[in-house]
């Protein structure tokens, strides 16, 4: 069975791409009777507030027609930002040798929260070097992953 995030991604990918952007990822957060649909868009030229507003209008129209969420929700559209969330193998691969922080569903090496350097991605497995130790982590065990920006 597809998760709500997967259904939303399938539903929203084409409309976002039709506007010239990439659907970087999305989050669906349910909190009681209210939910948040957070849509991240990216573009080679950068993402501006006007882009977010345009995508928000289009996505809102699609969600109104398809009606995939039965509760009240807030729609948020933004760029991934400098501490961009990472959603899939392709995105982790793009940031090899970069530092990330991840939250896991099941502990690895006794921890659910890790910070380390992405040293490889093979299939659906991430290799993360944490304090000199190489850890192999299944991508489906990652609840949340973010790039740590260098300044």
Curated annotation (Swiss-Prot):
Localisation: Cytoplasm
Disulfide topology: none
Chief place where the protein resides: cytoplasm
Classification via InterPro entries: Ribosome_maturation_RimP, RimP_C, RimP_C_sf, RimP_N, RimP_N_sf
Pfam families: DUF150_C, RimP_N
Record key words, sorted: Cytoplasm, Ribosome biogenesis
Spans through the membrane: none
GO BP term, example: translation
Single GO cellular component term: cytosol
Keyword Amino-acid biosynthesis: no
NCBIfam families linked: PRK00092.1-1
Function: Required for maturation of 30S ribosomal subunits.
Record family assignment: Belongs to the RimP family.
Protein's recorded name: Ribosome maturation factor RimP
Highest classification ranks of the organism: Bacteria, Pseudomonadati, Pseudomonadota, Gammaproteobacteria, Alteromonadales
């Amino acid at each position: 069975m597809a998760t709500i995030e997967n259904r939303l991604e399938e539903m929203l990918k084409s409309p976002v791409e039709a506007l010239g952007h990439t659907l970087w990822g999305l989050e669906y957060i349910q909190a009681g009777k209210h939910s948040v649909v957070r849509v991240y868009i990216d573009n080679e030229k950068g993402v501006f507030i006007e882009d977010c507003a345009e995508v928000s209008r289009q996505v809102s129209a699609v969600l109104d027609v398809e009606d995939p969420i039965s509760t009240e929700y807030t729609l948020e559209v933004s760029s991934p930002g400098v501490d961009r969330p990472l959603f899939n193998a392709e995105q982790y691969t793009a940031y090899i040798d970069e530092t990330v922080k991840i939250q896991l569903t099941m502990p690895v090496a006794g921890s659910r929260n890790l910070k380390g350097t992405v040293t490889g991605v093979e299939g659906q497995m991430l290799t993360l070097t944490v304090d000199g130790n190489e850890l192999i982590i299944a991508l489906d065990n990652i609840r949340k992953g973010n790039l740590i920006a260098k300044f």
